[in-house]
Amino acid sequence: MFLLYEYDIFWAFLIISSLIPILAFFVSGVLAPINKGPEKLSSYESGIEPMGNAWLQFRIRYYMFALVFVVFDVETVFLYPWAMSFDVLGISVFVEALIFVLILIVGLVYAWRKGALEWS
């Protein structure tokens, strides 16, 4: 039977952890001074005069390459706990991790075939 009161601590944590950033943004928006001027709108380059225009267009290739990198970086985060507890968990978890890696390899092959990993 599903008992809702067992999750009271979870819901309290979720509500409080959501309200703290919202409250912080609200308070900073109310208390912050509003000074708009040319210096406020100029780009900042480590304390020196900006060189060139700050608004540059990036090629979509860089975005796709970064997106593929993030996906496989997150894969590493998911596989690390599995690797650390491999001897305790057994063969069933090994099969699950293998399926996870195979799905990601299929995604990598798909991205490779679509040209997301090519620079030219």
UniProtKB/Swiss-Prot annotation:
Superkingdom to which the source organism belongs: Eukaryota
Record-listed E.C. numbers: 7.1.1.-
Gene Ontology MF: a single term: quinone binding
GO BP annotations listed: photosynthesis, light reaction
Transmembrane stretches, start-end: 9-29, 64-84, 88-108
Bilayer topology: Multi-pass membrane protein
Broad EC category: translocase
Pfam family, one: Oxidored_q4
Positions of disulphide bridges: none
Reaction it catalyzes: a plastoquinone + NADH + (n+1) H(+)(in) = a plastoquinol + NAD(+) + n H(+)(out); a plastoquinone + NADPH + (n+1) H(+)(in) = a plastoquinol + NADP(+) + n H(+)(out)
Subcellular location: Plastid, Chloroplast thylakoid membrane
Cited PANTHER family: NADH-UBIQUINONE OXIDOREDUCTASE CHAIN 3
Complex and partners: NDH is composed of at least 16 different subunits, 5 of which are encoded in the nucleus.
Purpose of the protein: NDH shuttles electrons from NAD(P)H:plastoquinone, via FMN and iron-sulfur (Fe-S) centers, to quinones in the photosynthetic chain and possibly in a chloroplast respiratory chain. The immediate electron acceptor for the enzyme in this species is believed to be plastoquinone. Couples the redox reaction to proton translocation, and thus conserves the redox energy in a proton gradient.
Family designation: Belongs to the complex I subunit 3 family.
Protein name (record): NAD(P)H-quinone oxidoreductase subunit 3, chloroplastic
